[in-house]
Amino acid sequence: MANKKSPASGWPIVQGDFHTGDPNSPVAVVTMGSHLDEGAICSAGAAIAGSCKTENLGLEKVIANVISNPNIRFVITCGTEVKGHLSGQSLIALHQNGVDGGKIVGSKGAIPFIENLSADNIKRFQEQVELVDIMESEDLGAISAKIKELTARDPGAFDAEAMIVEIKEEGGGAAEEGGEVRPMSAEVALIHARMKTIQRTITDIGFYDKYAAGVYGGKVEGLMIGLIVSFVIIGLLLVGHGVS
């Protein structure tokens, strides 16, 4: 029998639109934009099953609940894609490519910015689980069969303790309250993405200005200290010459 570990106390640590099953199961199921029978999916052997409608906060919640349970080694992505947000494609891109400057590399979603997960959190997710992509499938029979197939391949718990992440919902991105997120048109998605990029660029410029001001201040201070030391040395030399 595969070795198991205790998930974080009170797992799942982040609340959301999902059901839970056996926490020792190696499989988590994300139904993306579809509302399937998550209870039946958990009865088929999943540790946790539910939707994920946004490519930012939604993904953060999924990842937080996965890495806080070392027993989960597979994540099945299924159900329909969410128009504009593309949470399924974004999750796959994050697992494959990671995040650069807070943005999911390779994501085609509207606002693919991760604000609550550290580089260590993302690396842990990439190392802990294998993604199994059956996107657009809503067939409970096919999903249940995939759960059984992966359970038979259970490699045992990940070789590290549960990793706990705090998810703050007041950050940018679309909320998932009530499990309802309005799909975005391509035009609206593009506007949201550009607004987010501009916001981050402005923030980066502010940090650069502070850094440049600090460097300039340090140079001036160093110059003054150098002049003072030079005057002291010259004074000592003149005094010594007068004495001799």
Curated annotation (Swiss-Prot):
Molecular function GO labels: cobalt ion binding; tetrahydromethanopterin S-methyltransferase activity
Extracellular face residues: 244
Annotated cofactor note: Binds 1 5-hydroxybenzimidazolylcobamide group.
One GO CC term on file: plasma membrane
Chief location bin: membrane
Entries under InterPro entries matching the protein: MeTrfase_MtrA/MtxA (IPR030688), MtrA (IPR005778)
Membrane-side (Cytoplasmic) residue stretches: 1-222
Binding site for 5-hydroxybenzimidazolylcob(I)amide: 85
EC number: 7.2.1.4
Domain of life: Archaea
Example GO biological process: one-carbon metabolic process
Record flagged with keyword Transferase: yes
Cofactor(s) this protein cannot do without: 5-hydroxybenzimidazolylcob(I)amide
This protein's UniProt keywords: Cell membrane, Cobalt, Membrane, Methanogenesis, Methyltransferase, One-carbon metabolism, Transferase, Translocase, Transmembrane, Transmembrane helix
Location in the cell: Cell membrane
Pathway recorded for this protein: One-carbon metabolism; methanogenesis from CO(2); methyl-coenzyme M from 5,10-methylene-5,6,7,8-tetrahydromethanopterin: step 2/2
Annotated transmembrane regions: 223-243
Subunit structure and binding partners: The complex is composed of 8 subunits; MtrA, MtrB, MtrC, MtrD, MtrE, MtrF, MtrG and MtrH.
Chain's role: Part of a complex that catalyzes the formation of methyl-coenzyme M and tetrahydromethanopterin from coenzyme M and methyl-tetrahydromethanopterin. This is an energy-conserving, sodium-ion translocating step.
Entry's family note: Belongs to the MtrA family.
Record's protein name: Tetrahydromethanopterin S-methyltransferase subunit A
Chain's gene name: mtrA
